[in-house]
C-alpha cells in the first residue's frame, strides 16, 4: 500500500500506543481511591477590603467629560487640538517647524462662522424640544464631535454669543407671532428705567408650569394677557402685564426668573407702545382669542384707541381756555410747571390728552402762563391789603401759635408796641412809613424773619446784584410786598440817589422788559442789612423814610438742629388773626366777603352735567 503523499502518521501512532499502555497500567481500584471532594475554602476572600478613592475617580471622569463638552463648543477654530491624527501629533512633538512643511498644497481658505443653519436658527436644541422628552445623549455627543472635528453641515452651530441671542429670539418671535417684537414695544436703553406696563417673551418654559404662572403673576399685577405660543420649531410664553407698582427691566427679569426656572438671556422685556393704534389693535384682538388668558380690566391706552366711545372723546380739539382755567385754579404761573403737571393729567383729562397730541405744545404753554399772569396781576391790583392778607391766610391749613413770633421779638430785645405800630403803618402804606429795616450782626435771624413773612404774603424779592440791569425792580410790579435782602453800602447809596420816592410809598415809574415803562405805587418794602442807616449821617435823607429795628442776639438752635423759634406760616397766620384789629386791617364783612367768596373768574362754559 502506497503512502499518502504529504502526510506522516508515525507520531500519531506512537501517541495512541502510549495512551493504551497507560490505561492498562491504571486499575479500577486506583480510581476508587481518588477523592471526589474538592477544597473550596479559598474560593471566597473574606478579608477586609479597602474601598479606594472612588470620589477622585469620579472627579476625573467628570473633568474629562466637561473638557470634552467645552472643546465641542469652541467656534473660533473648526479643528480642535484633540482632533489631530496620531501622525500629526508625533510630528508636532518632534518639532513645530516640521508641522509647517508639506509637499501638498495647503488650503488657505478660511471658513466663515455659520450663525444659522438650514434646520436650526441658532438657539439651543433644548429650547426646541419639550423638556419632558427623553433625549439620547449619545446622539448629541456624536453630533458635537462632528462639529468640533471640522464637519460643518446641517447641524450648524447651536450656541451663539450674547450679542446674537437677542437677534435669534427676535427672529423666532416674528416667525411665530407674525409681527416684530420692536413694532409692539419701545426700547429702554437703561435697565434701571421704570415702567408700569411690560411686554415679555420667555423661552424654555415647561408646559406644566403655565397654570402656576397665571396664579403667581396675579399677586404682582393688575392686568395679565398671557399666551403659550407653540409651533413645530418654536415654543415660548408671550405676556402683556401691568404691575401694581412700576418696575425696571432688572426687577422684572428677576421676578420672572424667580417664578420660572429660565435663564435671563432667554427673556425679551420692553414696555409697550402705548400711543400706537396698530399696537393697541393687536393687543385688543389677542384679548378676544380663546387661546389667550386675560385677567383684569383692559388697559386704558388700549381702550382709548380701540373702543368707539373713547375714540369720540379723543377727537375733541384742544381748547386753550381750559388749560388757562386749570392753571389759574391751581396757581401755576411758571411755564415748566404748567407743561409738566398738565401733561400728567392726560390719563384723565381729554383736553390734556389733546394738548399732548398737538405739535404746538411750547406755544400753548407760553400763552397759558402769560394769560394766567395777566389775570392774577389784575386780580391782585383790585384787592386791598386787608383782602389780600385774608386770602393768603385762607390758603394756610391748620393753626399755629402766635406767641412764637412775640417770643422771638422779645428775644431780640425789640419793643413789641413800637414794632406793631411800624408794622401797621407798613401794611397800610402810609407815606414816609413804607419801608421797614431789620438790621444787626450776622446770624441773628433777620433774613429768616423777613422771608417767612414774605412767603405767607406772597411777596417778591429784589436783589441789588442785578442793579446794573434797568429791569431789576420789575418784580415789584407784580407784588403786594417786596424784600431787599442784605443791603450793603453801595445799595444804600443807590437808594439814597434813585429810590427816595419808592421808600416814601409814592408812585414810581418802573421799566418793564418787552413792555413800556409802567407807573405803579411802590408796595411795602422790607430790608435787611448789617448797617444801621440812622446812625450814619451820609444817609440823613433816608432817616425819615425808614423804620428800623435791631436784632442783637444770635438766632438759637436746638440740639437736634431745629430752630429755637418756629416762624412758620401757621404761626404767622395765628399772629395776624390775633392782632387783626391792632393792625387796623379792615373787616372782611365790610368789604362784602361774608364767608368764603365764590370763584371770581370763570373762563369756560359750565358743562351740562356740572352742578351749579
UniProtKB/Swiss-Prot annotation:
<keyword id="KW-0347">Helicase</keyword>
<feature type="binding site">
    <location>
        <begin position="440"/>
        <end position="447"/>
    </location>
    <ligand>
        <name>ATP</name>
    </ligand>
</feature>
<keyword id="KW-0413">Isomerase</keyword>
<feature type="short sequence motif" description="Nuclear export signal">
    <location>
        <begin position="94"/>
        <end position="103"/>
    </location>
</feature>
<keyword id="KW-0244">Early protein</keyword>
<dbReference type="InterPro" id="IPR014015">
    <property type="entry name" value="Helicase_SF3_DNA-vir"/>
</dbReference>
<comment type="function">
    <text>ATP-dependent DNA 3'-5' helicase required for initiation of viral DNA replication. It forms a complex with the viral E2 protein. The E1-E2 complex binds to the replication origin which contains binding sites for both proteins. During the initial step, a dimer of E1 interacts with a dimer of protein E2 leading to a complex that binds the viral origin of replication with high specificity. Then, a second dimer of E1 displaces the E2 dimer in an ATP-dependent manner to form the E1 tetramer.</text>
</comment>
<comment type="similarity">
    <text>Belongs to the papillomaviridae E1 protein family.</text>
</comment>
<dbReference type="GO" id="GO:0042025">
    <property type="term" value="C:host cell nucleus"/>
</dbReference>
<keyword id="KW-0238">DNA-binding</keyword>
<dbReference type="InterPro" id="IPR014000">
    <property type="entry name" value="PPV_DNA_helicase_E1_N"/>
</dbReference>
<dbReference type="InterPro" id="IPR001177">
    <property type="entry name" value="PPV_DNA_helicase_E1_C"/>
</dbReference>
<keyword id="KW-0832">Ubl conjugation</keyword>
<dbReference type="GO" id="GO:0005524">
    <property type="term" value="F:ATP binding"/>
</dbReference>
<keyword id="KW-1048">Host nucleus</keyword>
<dbReference type="InterPro" id="IPR027417">
    <property type="entry name" value="P-loop_NTPase"/>
</dbReference>
<dbReference type="GO" id="GO:0006260">
    <property type="term" value="P:DNA replication"/>
</dbReference>
<comment type="subunit">
    <text>Can form hexamers. Interacts with E2 protein; this interaction increases E1 DNA binding specificity. Interacts with host DNA polymerase subunit POLA2. Interacts with host single stranded DNA-binding protein RPA1. Interacts with host TOP1; this interaction stimulates the enzymatic activity of TOP1.</text>
</comment>
<dbReference type="Pfam" id="PF00524">
    <property type="entry name" value="PPV_E1_N"/>
</dbReference>
<keyword id="KW-0547">Nucleotide-binding</keyword>
<keyword id="KW-0067">ATP-binding</keyword>
<protein>
    <recommendedName>
        <fullName>Replication protein E1</fullName>
        <ecNumber>5.6.2.4</ecNumber>
    </recommendedName>
</protein>
<feature type="region of interest" description="DNA-binding region">
    <location>
        <begin position="148"/>
        <end position="315"/>
    </location>
</feature>
<dbReference type="InterPro" id="IPR046935">
    <property type="entry name" value="PPV_E1_DBD_sf"/>
</dbReference>
<dbReference type="InterPro" id="IPR046832">
    <property type="entry name" value="PPV_E1_DBD"/>
</dbReference>
<dbReference type="GO" id="GO:0016887">
    <property type="term" value="F:ATP hydrolysis activity"/>
</dbReference>
<dbReference type="GO" id="GO:0003678">
    <property type="term" value="F:DNA helicase activity"/>
</dbReference>
<dbReference type="Pfam" id="PF00519">
    <property type="entry name" value="PPV_E1_C"/>
</dbReference>
<keyword id="KW-1017">Isopeptide bond</keyword>
<keyword id="KW-0378">Hydrolase</keyword>
<feature type="cross-link" description="Glycyl lysine isopeptide (Lys-Gly) (interchain with G-Cter in SUMO)">
    <location>
        <position position="521"/>
    </location>
</feature>
<dbReference type="Pfam" id="PF20450">
    <property type="entry name" value="PPV_E1_DBD"/>
</dbReference>
<feature type="domain" description="SF3 helicase">
    <location>
        <begin position="414"/>
        <end position="564"/>
    </location>
</feature>
<keyword id="KW-0597">Phosphoprotein</keyword>
<dbReference type="InterPro" id="IPR037102">
    <property type="entry name" value="Znf_lg_T-Ag_D1_dom_sf"/>
</dbReference>
<keyword id="KW-0235">DNA replication</keyword>
<feature type="region of interest" description="Disordered">
    <location>
        <begin position="587"/>
        <end position="612"/>
    </location>
</feature>
<dbReference type="GO" id="GO:0003677">
    <property type="term" value="F:DNA binding"/>
</dbReference>
<feature type="modified residue" description="Phosphoserine; by host">
    <location>
        <position position="80"/>
    </location>
</feature>
<feature type="short sequence motif" description="Nuclear localization signal">
    <location>
        <begin position="74"/>
        <end position="76"/>
    </location>
</feature>
<dbReference type="InterPro" id="IPR016393">
    <property type="entry name" value="Rep_E1_papillomaV"/>
</dbReference>
<feature type="modified residue" description="Phosphoserine; by host">
    <location>
        <position position="95"/>
    </location>
</feature>
Amino acid at each position: 500500500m502506497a503512502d499518502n503523499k504529504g502526510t506522516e502518521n508515525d507520531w500519531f501512532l506512537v501517541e495512541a500506543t502510549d495512551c493504551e499502555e497507560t490505561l492498562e497500567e491504571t486499575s479500577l481500584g486506583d480510581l476508587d481511591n481518588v477523592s471526589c471532594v474538592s477544597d473550596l475554602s479559598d474560593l471566597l476572600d473574606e478579608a477586609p477590603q479597602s474601598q479606594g478613592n472612588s470620589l477622585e475617580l469620579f472627579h476625573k471622569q467628570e473633568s474629562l467629560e466637561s473638557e470634552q463638552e467645552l472643546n465641542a463648543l469652541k467656534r473660533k477654530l473648526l479643528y480642535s487640538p484633540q482632533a489631530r491624527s496620531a501622525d500629526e501629533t508625533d510630528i508636532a512633538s518632534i518639532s513645530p517647524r516640521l508641522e509647517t512643511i508639506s509637499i501638498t498644497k495647503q488650503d488657505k481658505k478660511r471658513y466663515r462662522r455659520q450663525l444659522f443653519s438650514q434646520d436650526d436658527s441658532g438657539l439651543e436644541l433644548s429650547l426646541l424640544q419639550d423638556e419632558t422628552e427623553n433625549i439620547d445623549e449619545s446622539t448629541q455627543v456624536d453630533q458635537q464631535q462632528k462639529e468640533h472635528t471640522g464637519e460643518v453641515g446641517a447641524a450648524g452651530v447651536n450656541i451663539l454669543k450674547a450679542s446674537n441671542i437677542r437677534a435669534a429670539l427676535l427672529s423666532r418671535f416674528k416667525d411665530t407671532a407674525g409681527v416684530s417684537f420692536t413694532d409692539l414695544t419701545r426700547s429702554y436703553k437703561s435697565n434701571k428705567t421704570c415702567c408700569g406696563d411690560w411686554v415679555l417673551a420667555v423661552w424654555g418654559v415647561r408646559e406644566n408650569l403655565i397654570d402656576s404662572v397665571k396664579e403667581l403673576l396675579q399677586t404682582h399685577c393688575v392686568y395679565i394677557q398671557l399666551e403659550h405660543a407653540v409651533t413645530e420649531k418654536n415654543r415660548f410664553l408671550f405676556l402683556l402685564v401691568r404691575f401694581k407698582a412700576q418696575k425696571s427691566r432688572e426687577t422684572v427679569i428677576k421676578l420672572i426668573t424667580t417664578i420660572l426656572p429660565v435663564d435671563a438671556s432667554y427673556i425679551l422685556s420692553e414696555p409697550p407702545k402705548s400711543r400706537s393704534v396698530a399696537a393697541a389693535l393687536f393687543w385688543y384682538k389677542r384679548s378676544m382669542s380663546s387661546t389667550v388668558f386675560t385677567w383684569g380690566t383692559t388697559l386704558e391706552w388700549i381702550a382709548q384707541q380701540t373702543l368707539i366711545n373713547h375714540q369720540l372723546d379723543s377727537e375733541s380739539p384742544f381748547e386753550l381756555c381750559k388749560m388757562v382755567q386749570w392753571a389759574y385754579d391751581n396757581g401755576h404761573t411758571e411755564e415748566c410747571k404748567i407743561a409738566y403737571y398738565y401733561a400728567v393729567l392726560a390719563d384723565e383729562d381729554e383736553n390734556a390728552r389733546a394738548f399732548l397730541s398737538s405739535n404746538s405744545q411750547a406755544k400753548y404753554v407760553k400763552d397759558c402762563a402769560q394769560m394766567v399772569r395777566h389775570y392774577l396781576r389784575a386780580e391782585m391790583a383790585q384787592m386791598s391789603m386787608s383782602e389780600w392778607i385774608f386770602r393768603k391766610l385762607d390758603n394756610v391749613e391748620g393753626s399755629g401759635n402766635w406767641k412764637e413770633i412775640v417770643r422771638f421779638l422779645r428775644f431780640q430785645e425789640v419793643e413789641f408796641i413800637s414794632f406793631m405800630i411800624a408794622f401797621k403803618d407798613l401794611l397800610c402804606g402810609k407815606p414816609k412809613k413804607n419801608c421797614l429795616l431789620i438790621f444787626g450782626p450776622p446770624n441773628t435771624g433777620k433774613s429768616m424773619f423777613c422771608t417767612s413773612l414774605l412767603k405767607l404774603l406772597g411777596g417778591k424779592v429784589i436783589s441789588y446784584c442785578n442793579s446794573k440791569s434797568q429791569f431789576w425792580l420789575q418784580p415789584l410790579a407784580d407784588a403786594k410786598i417786596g424784600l431787599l435782602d442784605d443791603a450793603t453800602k453801595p445799595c444804600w447809596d443807590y437808594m439814597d440817589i434813585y429810590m427816595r420816592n419808592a421808600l416814601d410809598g409814592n408812585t414810581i415809574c418802573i421799566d418793564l422788559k418787552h413792555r413800556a415803562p409802567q407807573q405803579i405805587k411802590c408796595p411795602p418794602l422790607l430790608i435787611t442789612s448789617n448797617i444801621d442807616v440812622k446812625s450814619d449821617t451820609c444817609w440823613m435823607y433816608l432817616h425819615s423814610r425808614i423804620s428800623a429795628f435791631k436784632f442783637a442776639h444770635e438766632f438759637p438752635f436746638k440740639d437736634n438742629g431745629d430752630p429755637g423759634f418756629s416762624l412758620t406760616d401757621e404761626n404767622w397766620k395765628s399772629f395776624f388773626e390775633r392782632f387783626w384789629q391792632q393792625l387796623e386791617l379792615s373787616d372782611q364783612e365790610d368789604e362784602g366777603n361774608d364767608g368764603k367768596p365764590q370763584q371770581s373768574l370763570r373762563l369756560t362754559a359750565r358743562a351740562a352735567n356740572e352742578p351749579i
